[in-house]
């Protein structure tokens, strides 16, 4: 049983899926959900221990490749390895990102560039690398992970919100550029998603975690805490043939948090 959804998508069986940042959090939920659909899932991550452990648990339909997505040559090499192993990528999910907080006055040129490498640049070059194979097949789906933070103008993370806003523009432009080749590109935009990383950050203060969770729920239209499975359900739909008419769009899963 797929713990992320009871829905089965026949069109995802045997599809080759590539996910960055797949060893933990939302990315891990993606990996597990697609493997449960019968897809062949390659995933990238910096955390080799977590990645190898997940691949071992999931079996032959998963492939972990250690990768720092800031290293574009390594990223391209990983795409090539997936293609050698399973053939052209059918579904790409550009998930890797970090939303570290930072003060405006503390941002250096070096920090700015590193944040763009972490949160934006790799998404373009991953799409560039998989697009030829998708075009040869006449189909493909690319999902870019957005954020409601730029929609809300959230302070204290301007490098992150800038990168995520730019990713929205990239999604729309590439959707138009590649649509004639049967390639669909959409953004999946999460709201306040509870993950293992957040739980670890609040481990010494469980009451604080619950208070923070309740604060998000109070701002949402729907009164429950979202988790990674909510994103995984939407990703499966956007990757499947059921969403064949959807491209160039933002699909928001935030329980109404971004509506002010």
From Swiss-Prot:
Q: Which PROSITE patterns match?
A: ADH_SHORT (PS00061)
UniProt entry keywords in alphabetical sequence: NAD, Oxidoreductase
Signal peptide (from-to): none
By sequence similarity, the record places it as follows: Belongs to the short-chain dehydrogenases/reductases (SDR) family.
**What job does the chain carry out?**
Catalyzes the oxidation of sulfoquinovose to 6-deoxy-6-sulfo-D-glucono-1,5-lactone, with a strong preference for NAD(+) as the electron acceptor. Is involved in a degradation pathway of sulfoquinovose (SQ) that allows P.putida SQ1 to use SQ as the sole carbon and energy source for growth.
Q: How does activity depend on pH?
A: Optimum pH is 8-9.
The UniProt catalytic activity note for this protein reads: 6-sulfo-D-quinovose + NAD(+) = 6-deoxy-6-sulfo-D-glucono-1,5-lactone + NADH + H(+)
Q: Which Gene3D superfamilies match?
A: NAD(P)-binding Rossmann-like Domain
GO molecular-function annotation terms? oxidoreductase activity
| EC number, UniProt record | 1.1.1.390
Q: EC top class, in one word?
A: oxidoreductase
Please tell me whether the keyword Amino-acid biosynthesis is annotated for this protein: no
Record protein name field: Sulfoquinovose 1-dehydrogenase
- Induction of this protein: by what? Is highly up-regulated during growth on sulfoquinovose, compared to growth on glucose or succinate (at protein level).
Q: Which domain of life is it from?
A: Bacteria
Note the Pfam families from the entry.
adh_short_C2 (PF13561)
Instruction: Tell me which residues this entry annotates as catalytic.
Output: 160
